[in-house]
Design a protein with these regions (language model features):
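Bacterial N-terminal signal peptides that target proteins for export
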Residues: 2-17
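A short helix->beta-strand "capping" segment at the edge of beta-propeller domains
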Residues: 36-56
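Beta-strand-rich domains and repeat architectures in extracellular enzymes and scaffolds
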Residues: 51-84, 89-91
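Beta-rich, blade/repeat-based domains predominating
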Residues: 55-68, 92, 114-146, 182-208, ...
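Short glycine/acidic-enriched loop and turn motifs that connect beta-strands
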Residues: 77-82, 144-149, 215-218, 279-282, ...
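A short loop-to-beta-strand structural motif that recurs across blades of beta-propeller domains
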Residues: 84-87, 91-96, 163-166, 228-231, ...
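Short loop/turn segments immediately following beta-strands, especially the blade-tip
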Residues: 98-104, 172, 234-242, 294-300, ...
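Blade-level signature of beta-propeller repeat domains, shared across WD40, Kelch, NHL, RCC1
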Residues: 369-418
Length: 418
């Protein structure tokens, strides 16, 4: 065990070196070699592929309903690539509703539950009711840059970028929205609207944590000069913001380097975890795919918090299992898409998918969702943003079963040394 502990400490030191190398501008391939060595382990408990559904259009986000009986998927209607004008097609996105069957598979209930949405991305479920929004209301990130029109042209008009949080119930009824775009409270606080409102998570008190990846603002004339970071929206402010009023307890912003993407609150330590996606867009990310842990005090005092891992590529979705094991989706296109696993206090390992072969190839895994059921097993739903082909309506969502012993497997040595 002493040898194992030395190896773990050495790896932690190497992570710090990795960030330092990146900061000094050494070639990306040097960082990648170091990162691959640091994160070469696999999680001891493989996941089983239950289903690959081909029924979507660039699925970006997934969320379980409050009762766990349904899954909602955001179809982002992405077009193009980074090299040729990547963007979200105005008004082409929609939300799909699926039922969770007894065997863990999903079946389509309503393919187009809510339509006409621009850039529907991450979602979260409100745990504590307000006067306006019942507990169980789903909040959706939508309206973000980068935007393209139906002809594939980049949108230059600043007025057409209307980022917001859209609230709806399980039946697909829209209950309200919170404006995060031009003229909103968020622009007044930060000098810029939220440009790429990407993901959100709730804490047990109903406060919302929202990431702004701040990508795409330069397409407008004049451009938006946004900042990537994390917003905390107090539960007490939700109704006022939805009604267009100034809340007595306003949102708070913390700048985070590297274009933050996924965000979720740990069910065990209550901290807010944020990952970074900057490497996906060829942008500067000092962590080269990092994960930060922030307390509420960090946010209140405008502190970045602690970086707990780095060198993971370009991270998109982030979620926790029931016992606090963290999962991240690696979406960067020039290295394999995968799900990484962080046991508490440990560096990331890779989640192995069984059976192997073509079914295990993840094409742009994005905003994932996980939920535990009565038998102890957990379902992991993975939207695959880049699972494109020439025909509409058949992009992929993969459903995995994490066995009942998945979380307790963290007590075993992830490198297989004991």
């Amino acid at each position: 065990m002493l040898v194992l502990r030395f190896i773990q400490l050495s790896k932690l030191a190497a992570v710090g070196s990795l960030v330092a190398l990146s900061a000094f501008g050494l070639p990306a391939n040097v960082d990648r070699v170091v990162a691959e060595e640091i994160h070469s382990g696999v999680h001891p408990s493989p996941a089983v592929i239950l289903q690959v559904l081909k029924a979507f259009d660039n699925p970006e986000g997934a969320i379980f309903s409050a009762d766990g009986n349904h899954v909602f998927v955001s179809n982002s209607a992405e077009a193009g690539a980074l090299s040729d004008g990547f963007g979200w097609v105005e008004g082409a996105g929609y939300i799909s509703k699926l039922e969770v069957k007894a065997n863990g598979e999903l079946s389509m209930v309503t393919k187009r539950l809510i339509t006409g949405i621009t850039a529907p991305l991450g979602m979260g479920v409100l745990p504590v009711a307000t006067k306006k929004f019942p507990a169980g209301t789903i909040f959706l990130c939508t309206g973000s840059a980068p935007l393209i029109d139906s002809n594939g042209q980049a949108v230059k008009d600043r007025g057409r970028m209307r980022s917001k949080l859209l609230a709806f119930n399980d039946a697909g009824e829209v209950l309200g929205e919170i404006d995060t775009g031009q003229g909103s409270a968020f622009e007044r606080i930060n000098g810029s609207p939220i440009i790429l409102i990407n993901a959100l998570g709730f804490d047990a008190d109903g406060n919302i944590y929202v990431t702004d990846s701040a990508i795409g603002g330069d397409q407008f004339d004049p451009p938006f000069e946004g900042k990537g970071g994390l917003w905390m929206i107090p539960h007490s402010a939700l109704d006022a913001l939805a009604d267009g009023r100034t809340p007595s307890d306003p949102p708070v912003f913390v700048e985070i380097p590297g274009n933050p993407d996924g965000v979720e609150v740990s069910p065990t330590d209550g901290k807010i975890y944020v990952n970074t996606v900057g490497a996906f867009a060829g942008l500067t990310d000092p962590a080269n795919g990092g994960v930060y842990a922030l307390s509420k005090e960090d946010i209140a005092n405008n502190n970045l918090g602690q970086m707990i891992d780095s060198g993971l590529g370009a991270l998109d979705g982030l979620d926790f299992t029931a016992d606090g094991v963290m999962l991240n989706a690696q979406i960067r296109g020039d290295i394999p898409g995968k799900i990484t696993v962080n046991c508490k206090g440990e560096l990331a390992t890779t989640l192995v998918l069984q059976p192997g072969g073509a079914m295990s190839n993840l094409t742009g895994p994005a905003d994932i969702a996980v939920r535990r059921y009565a038998d102890g097993a957990q379902l992991l739903v993975i939207p695959e943003l880049f699972a494109r082909d020439a025909t509409p309506g058949d992009d992929e969502v993969t459903v995995l079963a994490l066995p009942a012993g998945f979380d307790t497997a963290c007590t075993r040595d992830v490198a297989g040394l004991n």
